[in-house]
A protein has these predicted regions:
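His/Asp/Glu-enriched, well-ordered alpha-helical/loop segment
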Residues: 1-86, 90-93
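Short, acidic, Ser/Thr-enriched surface-loop or helix-capping motifs
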Residues: 94, 103
Length: 110
């Protein structure tokens, strides 16, 4: 099993009105909708999907693997695990599972 997010460009933005692909999208309480009320896509990050999976009872290590190594292997990408010869971007968590820092292409973001 893998975890995915169909997050759209409003992910991480404050509630408000946006235009994406020529469509007006209103984000309220982290829910994005078009003018006719249809969902415009998810505003959940993959990290939030992992946290949700854990809340539903999936072991934490399995949830992280479902969001990283498993999909990478299915797509034939050398990523998703810390191993020689693999691309490795990381999130470093605090004890309360909040993000402490992110490492992308060797660059540290705090």
């Amino acid at each position: 099993m893998i975890l995915i997010s169909d997050s759209m460009r409003a992910t991480g933005l404050c509630d408000g009105d946006y235009e994406f692909g020529g469509l007006h999208v209103a984000v309220k309480d982290s829910v994005a909708r078009t003018d006719d009320g249809s969902l415009a896509g998810s505003t959940s990050t993959l990290f939030e999907c992992v946290q949700c999976a854990v809340k539903f009872g999936i072991p934490e290590a399995d949830a992280y693997m479902m969001a990283s190594q498993t999909p990478a292997e299915l797509m034939g990408i050398k990523a998703g695990k810390i191993c020689e010869g693999y691309d490795c971007d990381l999130i470093v968590l605090n004890e309360d599972d909040t993000i402490h820092k992110v490492i992308i292409n060797g660059r540290i973001y705090e």
